[in-house]
Protein backbone atom coordinates (compact mmCIF):
# COMPACT_ATOMS: atom_id res chain seq x y z
CA UNK A 1 0.00 0.00 0.00
CA UNK A 2 2.76 2.40 0.87
CA UNK A 3 4.64 1.84 -2.39
CA UNK A 4 1.40 2.22 -4.34
CA UNK A 5 0.42 5.54 -2.78
CA UNK A 6 3.98 6.86 -2.93
CA UNK A 7 4.10 6.08 -6.64
CA UNK A 8 0.77 7.90 -7.14
CA UNK A 9 2.29 11.06 -5.76
CA UNK A 10 5.49 10.78 -7.81
CA UNK A 11 3.44 10.16 -10.92
CA UNK A 12 1.29 13.27 -10.51
CA UNK A 13 4.41 15.40 -10.07
CA UNK A 14 6.39 13.93 -12.95
CA UNK A 15 3.36 13.94 -15.23
CA UNK A 16 2.78 17.65 -14.75
CA UNK A 17 6.45 18.45 -15.40
CA UNK A 18 6.37 16.50 -18.65
CA UNK A 19 3.04 17.97 -19.72
CA UNK A 20 4.33 21.52 -19.38
CA UNK A 21 8.05 21.29 -20.14
CA UNK A 22 7.66 18.42 -22.66
CA UNK A 23 10.64 16.60 -21.17
CA UNK A 24 11.15 13.64 -18.87
CA UNK A 25 12.97 14.69 -15.72
CA UNK A 26 14.92 11.53 -14.93
CA UNK A 27 16.60 13.38 -12.06
CA UNK A 28 13.31 13.56 -10.15
CA UNK A 29 14.05 10.42 -8.15
CA UNK A 30 17.46 11.80 -7.24
CA UNK A 31 15.88 15.02 -5.96
CA UNK A 32 13.86 12.74 -3.67
CA UNK A 33 17.17 11.21 -2.53
CA UNK A 34 18.67 14.64 -1.83
CA UNK A 35 15.59 15.64 0.16
CA UNK A 36 15.96 12.48 2.22
CA UNK A 37 19.63 13.23 2.95
CA UNK A 38 18.76 16.78 4.01
CA UNK A 39 16.28 15.40 6.55
CA UNK A 40 18.83 12.81 7.70
CA UNK A 41 21.54 15.43 8.27
CA UNK A 42 19.14 17.89 9.89
CA UNK A 43 17.64 15.37 12.31
CA UNK A 44 20.55 13.00 13.04
CA UNK A 45 23.47 15.40 12.60
CA UNK A 46 22.12 18.79 13.64
CA UNK A 47 19.41 17.66 16.05
CA UNK A 48 16.71 19.79 14.43
CA UNK A 49 13.04 19.28 15.10
CA UNK A 50 11.60 16.93 12.41
CA UNK A 51 9.11 19.58 11.26
CA UNK A 52 11.92 22.11 10.74
CA UNK A 53 13.97 19.43 8.99
CA UNK A 54 11.11 18.73 6.58
CA UNK A 55 10.66 22.45 5.86
CA UNK A 56 14.40 22.80 5.24
CA UNK A 57 14.29 19.83 2.87
CA UNK A 58 11.39 21.35 0.92
CA UNK A 59 13.17 24.69 0.58
CA UNK A 60 16.46 23.14 -0.58
CA UNK A 61 14.78 20.78 -3.06
CA UNK A 62 12.61 23.61 -4.43
CA UNK A 63 15.67 25.77 -5.05
CA UNK A 64 17.50 22.79 -6.53
CA UNK A 65 14.66 22.19 -8.98
CA UNK A 66 14.78 25.80 -10.17
CA UNK A 67 18.58 25.68 -10.57
CA UNK A 68 18.50 22.37 -12.46
CA UNK A 69 15.85 23.67 -14.83
CA UNK A 70 17.62 26.97 -15.42
CA UNK A 71 21.15 25.60 -15.83
CA UNK A 72 20.70 22.16 -17.38
CA UNK A 73 17.37 22.12 -19.20
CA UNK A 74 16.47 25.65 -20.28
CA UNK A 75 19.45 26.14 -22.65
CA UNK A 76 18.43 22.96 -24.50
CA UNK A 77 14.69 23.58 -24.58
CA UNK A 78 14.74 24.53 -28.26
CA UNK A 79 17.44 22.05 -29.26
CA UNK A 80 17.07 20.46 -32.67
CA UNK A 81 17.01 16.95 -31.20
CA UNK A 82 14.91 16.01 -28.14
CA UNK A 83 17.61 13.47 -27.30
CA UNK A 84 19.83 16.34 -26.13
CA UNK A 85 17.46 17.12 -23.25
CA UNK A 86 16.95 13.44 -22.48
CA UNK A 87 20.69 12.79 -22.25
CA UNK A 88 21.13 15.89 -20.09
CA UNK A 89 18.39 14.70 -17.72
CA UNK A 90 20.13 11.35 -17.32
CA UNK A 91 23.43 13.20 -16.79
CA UNK A 92 21.91 15.35 -14.04
CA UNK A 93 20.64 12.18 -12.38
CA UNK A 94 24.12 10.61 -12.35
CA UNK A 95 25.63 13.91 -11.19
CA UNK A 96 23.36 14.09 -8.14
CA UNK A 97 24.05 10.45 -7.29
CA UNK A 98 27.81 10.89 -7.46
CA UNK A 99 27.81 14.17 -5.52
CA UNK A 100 25.83 12.40 -2.78
CA UNK A 101 28.35 9.55 -2.96
CA UNK A 102 31.25 11.98 -2.45
CA UNK A 103 29.58 13.80 0.44
CA UNK A 104 27.96 10.96 2.38
CA UNK A 105 29.73 7.86 1.06
CA UNK A 106 28.28 4.58 -0.14
CA UNK A 107 27.43 3.22 3.31
CA UNK A 108 23.76 2.87 4.16
CA UNK A 109 22.59 5.54 6.58
CA UNK A 110 20.04 4.40 9.14
CA UNK A 111 18.00 6.66 11.36
CA UNK A 112 14.81 6.68 13.40
CA UNK A 113 11.48 7.43 11.78
CA UNK A 114 10.87 11.11 11.10
CA UNK A 115 7.13 10.49 11.17
CA UNK A 116 5.96 8.32 14.05
CA UNK A 117 2.24 7.55 14.01
CA UNK A 118 0.14 4.72 15.46
CA UNK A 119 -0.79 1.85 13.18
CA UNK A 120 -4.34 0.86 12.21
CA UNK A 121 -5.25 -2.75 13.01
CA UNK A 122 -8.03 -4.47 11.11
CA UNK A 123 -9.62 -7.93 11.22
CA UNK A 124 -8.66 -8.49 14.82
CA UNK A 125 -5.08 -7.41 14.27
CA UNK A 126 -4.35 -9.75 11.36
CA UNK A 127 -4.11 -6.76 9.01
CA UNK A 128 -1.88 -3.87 10.11
CA UNK A 129 -1.64 -0.60 8.19
CA UNK A 130 1.15 1.65 9.43
CA UNK A 131 0.56 5.30 10.19
CA UNK A 132 3.07 6.31 7.50
CA UNK A 133 1.10 4.32 4.91
CA UNK A 134 -2.13 6.05 5.92
CA UNK A 135 -0.48 9.48 5.69
CA UNK A 136 1.02 8.58 2.31
CA UNK A 137 -2.32 7.42 0.87
CA UNK A 138 -4.19 10.48 2.09
CA UNK A 139 -1.32 12.73 1.00
CA UNK A 140 -1.30 11.23 -2.50
CA UNK A 141 -5.02 11.85 -2.92
CA UNK A 142 -4.78 15.40 -1.57
CA UNK A 143 -1.80 16.24 -3.78
CA UNK A 144 -3.60 14.97 -6.89
CA UNK A 145 -6.72 16.97 -6.02
CA UNK A 146 -4.64 20.02 -5.10
CA UNK A 147 -2.71 19.95 -8.37
CA UNK A 148 -5.91 19.66 -10.39
CA UNK A 149 -7.51 22.57 -8.50
CA UNK A 150 -4.33 24.65 -8.77
CA UNK A 151 -4.16 24.16 -12.53
CA UNK A 152 -7.86 24.83 -13.13
CA UNK A 153 -8.49 27.66 -10.65
CA UNK A 154 -5.34 29.83 -10.50
CA UNK A 155 -3.72 32.16 -13.02
CA UNK A 156 -0.40 30.37 -12.67
CA UNK A 157 -2.13 27.03 -13.20
CA UNK A 158 -3.89 28.34 -16.29
CA UNK A 159 -0.55 29.60 -17.58
CA UNK A 160 0.90 26.12 -17.06
CA UNK A 161 -2.00 24.62 -18.99
CA UNK A 162 -1.52 27.10 -21.82
CA UNK A 163 2.22 26.39 -22.02
CA UNK A 164 1.56 22.65 -22.09
CA UNK A 165 -0.85 23.08 -25.00
CA UNK A 166 1.20 25.47 -27.13
CA UNK A 167 4.30 27.31 -25.93
CA UNK A 168 4.37 29.64 -28.92
CA UNK A 169 0.75 30.72 -28.58
CA UNK A 170 1.16 31.13 -24.82
CA UNK A 171 4.14 33.42 -25.36
CA UNK A 172 2.16 35.50 -27.85
CA UNK A 173 -0.57 35.90 -25.22
CA UNK A 174 1.98 37.43 -22.83
CA UNK A 175 2.75 34.37 -20.70
CA UNK A 176 6.33 34.12 -19.47
CA UNK A 177 7.11 30.56 -20.59
CA UNK A 178 10.46 30.32 -18.79
CA UNK A 179 8.98 31.52 -15.51
CA UNK A 180 6.03 29.13 -15.83
CA UNK A 181 8.28 26.13 -16.42
CA UNK A 182 10.54 27.17 -13.52
CA UNK A 183 7.52 27.32 -11.21
CA UNK A 184 6.54 23.84 -12.39
CA UNK A 185 9.97 22.46 -11.51
CA UNK A 186 9.91 24.29 -8.17
CA UNK A 187 6.57 22.73 -7.23
CA UNK A 188 7.64 19.29 -8.42
CA UNK A 189 10.94 19.40 -6.55
CA UNK A 190 9.32 20.70 -3.36
CA UNK A 191 6.85 17.83 -3.42
CA UNK A 192 9.73 15.45 -4.14
CA UNK A 193 11.18 16.47 -0.77
CA UNK A 194 7.94 15.38 0.91
CA UNK A 195 8.14 12.10 -0.99
CA UNK A 196 11.67 11.64 0.35
CA UNK A 197 10.49 12.18 3.92
CA UNK A 198 7.73 9.59 3.56
CA UNK A 199 10.09 7.17 1.83
CA UNK A 200 12.61 7.35 4.67
CA UNK A 201 9.86 7.07 7.26
CA UNK A 202 8.70 3.81 5.71
CA UNK A 203 12.20 2.51 4.96
CA UNK A 204 14.61 4.20 7.42
CA UNK A 205 17.76 3.54 5.41
CA UNK A 206 19.41 5.75 2.84
CA UNK A 207 22.02 5.47 0.06
CA UNK A 208 22.93 7.73 -2.89
CA UNK A 209 20.84 5.42 -5.10
CA UNK A 210 17.71 5.47 -2.96
CA UNK A 211 15.71 7.53 -5.45
CA UNK A 212 16.89 5.85 -8.66
CA UNK A 213 14.49 2.90 -8.90
CA UNK A 214 11.44 4.74 -7.49
CA UNK A 215 12.05 7.47 -10.07
CA UNK A 216 12.17 4.98 -12.94
CA UNK A 217 9.06 3.17 -11.70
CA UNK A 218 7.31 6.53 -11.47
CA UNK A 219 8.02 7.02 -15.17
CA UNK A 220 6.62 3.55 -15.95
CA UNK A 221 3.40 4.32 -14.06
CA UNK A 222 3.11 7.69 -15.82
CA UNK A 223 3.34 5.96 -19.21
CA UNK A 224 0.80 3.36 -18.07
CA UNK A 225 -1.71 5.98 -16.95
CA UNK A 226 -1.07 8.37 -19.83
CA UNK A 227 1.64 11.01 -19.80
CA UNK A 228 0.14 14.47 -19.41
CA UNK A 229 -2.92 13.26 -17.44
CA UNK A 230 -2.90 13.71 -13.66
CA UNK A 231 -5.82 11.27 -13.06
CA UNK A 232 -4.13 8.82 -15.43
CA UNK A 233 -0.89 9.11 -13.48
CA UNK A 234 -2.79 8.45 -10.26
CA UNK A 235 -4.46 5.35 -11.72
CA UNK A 236 -1.16 4.16 -13.17
CA UNK A 237 0.48 4.40 -9.76
CA UNK A 238 -2.33 2.44 -8.11
CA UNK A 239 -2.40 -0.35 -10.72
CA UNK A 240 1.36 -0.81 -10.89
CA UNK A 241 1.67 -0.71 -7.11
CA UNK A 242 -0.96 -3.44 -6.78
CA UNK A 243 0.72 -5.53 -9.49
CA UNK A 244 4.05 -5.19 -7.70
CA UNK A 245 2.56 -6.21 -4.35
CA UNK A 246 0.82 -9.28 -5.79
CA UNK A 247 3.92 -10.15 -7.79
CA UNK A 248 6.01 -10.19 -4.60
CA UNK A 249 3.36 -12.16 -2.71
CA UNK A 250 2.45 -14.82 -5.25
CA UNK A 251 5.28 -15.02 -7.79
CA UNK A 252 8.66 -13.88 -6.49
CA UNK A 253 10.01 -10.80 -4.76
CA UNK A 254 12.96 -10.93 -7.15
CA UNK A 255 10.58 -10.70 -10.13
CA UNK A 256 8.70 -7.62 -8.91
CA UNK A 257 10.76 -5.14 -10.93
CA UNK A 258 10.58 -7.37 -14.01
CA UNK A 259 6.78 -7.37 -13.75
CA UNK A 260 6.70 -3.57 -13.65
CA UNK A 261 8.92 -3.16 -16.70
CA UNK A 262 7.07 -5.96 -18.50
CA UNK A 263 3.89 -3.93 -18.10
CA UNK A 264 5.68 -0.94 -19.64
CA UNK A 265 6.57 -2.98 -22.74
CA UNK A 266 2.99 -4.28 -23.11
CA UNK A 267 1.50 -0.78 -22.76
CA UNK A 268 3.91 0.71 -25.30
CA UNK A 269 2.96 -2.03 -27.78
CA UNK A 270 -0.81 -2.11 -27.21
CA UNK A 271 -1.68 1.50 -26.27
CA UNK A 272 1.33 3.86 -26.36
CA UNK A 273 -0.73 6.81 -25.09
CA UNK A 274 -1.62 4.99 -21.86
CA UNK A 275 -5.01 4.59 -20.18
CA UNK A 276 -6.09 8.25 -20.20
CA UNK A 277 -3.43 9.76 -22.46
CA UNK A 278 -4.39 11.66 -25.60
CA UNK A 279 -3.00 10.94 -29.04
CA UNK A 280 -1.83 14.44 -29.99
CA UNK A 281 -0.30 15.06 -33.39
CA UNK A 282 2.18 17.93 -33.35
CA UNK A 283 2.27 20.18 -36.37
CA UNK A 284 5.68 20.85 -37.86
Q: What residues fall within each predicted segment?
A:
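Hydrophobic core segments of alpha-helical transmembrane domains in multi-pass membrane transport
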Residues: 36-40, 58-64, 92-100, 139-148, ...
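Single conserved hydrophobic/aromatic residue that forms the stacking wall/gate
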Residues: 1-9, 13
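Transmembrane alpha-helical segments in multi-pass inner-membrane proteins
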Residues: 47-59, 185-192, 198, 202-262
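Alpha-helical transmembrane segments within multi-pass membrane transporters and channels
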Residues: 47-92, 99, 235-240, 271
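Helix-loop-helix "hairpin" substructures at the membrane interface of multi-pass membrane proteins
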Residues: 126-206, 230-236
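Membrane-embedded helix boundary and interhelical linker motif in transport proteins
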Residues: 20-67, 71, 226
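Transmembrane helix-bundle core of multi-pass membrane transporters
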Residues: 75-76, 82-153, 180, 246, ...
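Short, non-helical or kinked segments that cap or interrupt transmembrane helices
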Residues: 16-36, 50, 79-84, 156-159, ...
Amino acid sequence: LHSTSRRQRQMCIRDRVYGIAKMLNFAHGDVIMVGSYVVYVAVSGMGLNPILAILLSIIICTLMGVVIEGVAYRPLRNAASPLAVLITAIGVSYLLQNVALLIWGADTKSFSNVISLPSLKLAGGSIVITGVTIVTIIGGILIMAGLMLFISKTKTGQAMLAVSEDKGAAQLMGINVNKTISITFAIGSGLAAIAGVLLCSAYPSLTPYTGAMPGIKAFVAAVFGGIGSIPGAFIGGVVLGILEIFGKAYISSQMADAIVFGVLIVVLVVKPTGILGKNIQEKV
